[in-house]
Amino acid sequence: MGDYINVKEIFGCDVFNDSVMQDRLPKKVYRELKKTIEEGKELSMEIADVVAHEMKEWAIEKGATHYCHWFQPLTGVTAEKHDAFVTAPKEDGKVLLSFSGKELIKGEPDASSFPSGGLRATFEARGYTTWDCTSPAFVRHDAAGGILCIPTAFCSYTGEALDQKTPLLRSMEAINTQALRLLRLFGNTTSKKVTPSVGAEQEYFLVDKQKWLQRKDLIYTGRTLFGAMPPKGQEMDDHYFGTIRQRISAYMKEVNEECWKLGVTAKTQHNEVAPAQHELAPIYAPVNIAADHNQIMMRILKKVASRHGMRCLLHEKPFAGVNGSGKHNNWSLTTDDGINLLEPGKTPHENIQFLLVLTCILKAVDEHADLLRESAADVGNDERLGGNEAPPAVISVFLGEQLQDVLEQLISTGTATHSKTGEILDTGVKTLPDFMKDATDRNRTSPFAFTGNKFEFRMVGSRDSISECNVVLNTIAAEVFREACDRLEAAEDFDTAVHDLIKEYATEHQRIVFNGNGYAPEWEAEAKRRGLPILPSMVDAIPALTTDKAVKLFESFNVFTRAELESRAEIQYEGYAKAINIEAKTMVDIATKQIIPAVIRYTTVLAESINSVKAVSAALDVSVQTSLLEKSSTLLAETKAAMDKLSGLIAEAEAHEEGRDRAVFFRESVVPAMKALRKPVDELEMIVDKDMWPMPSYGDLIFEV
């Protein structure tokens, strides 16, 4: 029974969670800290010193020798600097282990070395990390030993947010304030807090480490830049929910254990649609904790893969021709006393509070569809969105038959009198029980779908932080809640006013609702007719961040300033250009050093074969060798010409000013040139001797794991 895991015993064992604080902190200190966590009360340095001491003692017992402020700058990954607990040696040469409240609360990383979009110059280096006590500290064990990781926010010396966490916490305050106002209108006086609750489904690929090491494109960019499809892809639908291979099962087992120890509620695991693709989904958590947990999960997925002789690929589109990877963001609003504001109940037409919340969200998504689209903008997502594998790049809302029918009743007659219910599903097999179907089907093609008691935003890229999309969701919902509350609080007749408001929102924003097939080519034309924003690429979407509408929205809730929004737009433009530049240079490097030499060797062998056969007898047939030689030589020339053109465009890009101008040039000129280079190379792979091809094929990568 060596493989037995006592989940209850190991869960959260490396987390300084509430139960640990209750056990270790003096009662007064614990109560004060809980007030800070739950009510935002300022934490005194006296209390911080006590918390820091107990946190240090607990961490040392867990094997920690260092601590770090663990934060999420605008690089897309987490950052940390390790400091040991040791102090300067005393006269006898011995050291003490120390960790103060000041060290817990504040750190000073170099702000100029992280992306700031112009907010920090190289000579303006000071930045601050500050403890986020709402997200528990944890001890991470790796080759460096035990590290006490303290979740923190990161800001500049002048106070601008330079991370993902700070605006997320601000947006949580905004939605909490406005949602509580809404609840009070309906007579709820007991709920004290409304928190966005999120579960993020994480998709990923696994490939063999030795094969990964032979692919410079995977090493440098996270995705394959060349590669012909094997005879079989995902068309048999036999990988999705299929039996998990033993090697992958062993990997998943260790991933689960690592997640559980750090308090991450890894719940559901399965094979995804594409070969070598998988998914891991946690249970819901408050959105700031869910965002931290997702970062922890991605690190664990990568770390454990290495131990098992594999590499975990989190890129949105590591392989052309098969599905890419996303991160479905399941978002709901819950109170501290267990009420889900997105729970329709059995009779949604009678649930006025739910209908108001629902129509407010419809209005929010319709008015800020461009911002929601931008929140999922990523250079890798450009390769994924819009294919028959992921939502289209057009924001729409799926409600399903039941809620659509209720809204149509409201719009057409002014009154909703009934709700559709699920019917009994008769399987036709006596030994199988009959059961009630759901009142509506699911729509996997919708980017923003209502799924029972939550909204599922399916656009987010697999390697991206979930913070950005949730900042947008929280803030746009808060804006419409505020507008609704302003009107309803001033109304003389609440019942009439709320009824009229629900009908108004449903009527004016029904264009955002689409329950059809988002993959259908007709949908884009229909979306254009409806006036919905169509933003196919990251570069198209970024301007949504800095419109007057967006600035007014975010500044009104103190989520972002104009300067912060402009800096983030600049960072995204730069990030796009740098990513494409690296990919383009990698393609040229691989073509120059690996592919062209390999094809030259192959054509030489063919030429020698032709000459050798003809030397025996001029009458012998060499048409096969000749045909292959002609085709490979033609494709080789096309490859060289395409490579030269791409090299020239890479050099030309340097002349374009950093920011939007350079990003647009990469999208409009460099990306098409990259595709032009890939085409002849992939054709060559199909005819060149496999033993001579310089890198593992798609078949090797996705079927031999």
Label every model-predicted segment:
Residues 10-125:
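Active-site core of metal-dependent hydrolases
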Residues 76-92, 109-112, 117, 215, ...:
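Short linear, low-complexity motifs centered on an aromatic residue
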Residues 1-7, 704-705:
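Basic/polar N-terminal segments that are highly enriched at the extreme N-terminus
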Residues 64, 68-70, 293-307, 333, ...:
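Hydrophobic/aromatic-rich, well-ordered segments within soluble, folded domains that form packed cores
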Residues 87-122, 237, 360-361, 484-493, ...:
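Short, intrinsically disordered, low-complexity segments enriched in Ser/Thr and Pro
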Residues 1, 10-18, 177, 181-183:
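Flexible inter-domain linker/hinge segments
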